[in-house]
């Protein structure tokens, strides 16, 4: 089906272009959401008559998204979740959670604007892409940790999955005095 795009759609085209799309995509997504019109003579003249208002509305949306992007871009958010000793989360951080975190900070972002290929399932620093407008894309950082103190340590570059980081204990001090380590330096091969 041929449609006239009423706004820029990534990987499809710019506003005003006539593009060929699958019937289901047009009927179930583009037409109901007002992102496109069927490409016929009547709709082409209608689009040309409304082109100036559509461009003004698109520019207004883009400027609003750019204002939010200027505040959010590169910002870091702390996410406290339960996790095991290896750093594996008991659950995950999904797009829904990112939206809730941003809403708590006063930003109104839709779930469809958060681009996570897979949910976050481990503690650490994770970059998340936000598509605020078809032409405005930013990244925020999620600092996923077991506590606020760990998040602070993690933001300074500390590794939190070792025994020392978890318990505050030196691993070497836990070894018995007569512990034999075949990989340690100074072991004479004749003795072994």
Swiss-Prot record:
It comes from the Bacteria. Residues 179-192 have a biased composition (Acidic residues). One of its GO terms (cellular component) is ribosome. The keyword Ribonucleoprotein applies. GO terms for biological process: translation. Keywords: Ribonucleoprotein, Ribosomal protein, RNA-binding, rRNA-binding. Residues 172-192 are annotated as: Disordered. InterPro entries: Ribosomal_bL9 (IPR000244), Ribosomal_bL9/RNase_H1_N (IPR009027), Ribosomal_bL9_bac/chp (IPR020594), Ribosomal_bL9_C (IPR020069), Ribosomal_bL9_C_sf (IPR036791), Ribosomal_bL9_N (IPR020070), Ribosomal_bL9_N_sf (IPR036935). Pfam families: Ribosomal_L9_C, Ribosomal_L9_N. GO terms for molecular function: rRNA binding; structural constituent of ribosome. Binds to the 23S rRNA. NCBIfam families: L9 (TIGR00158). This is Large ribosomal subunit protein bL9. It comes from Rhizobium leguminosarum bv. trifolii (strain WSM2304).
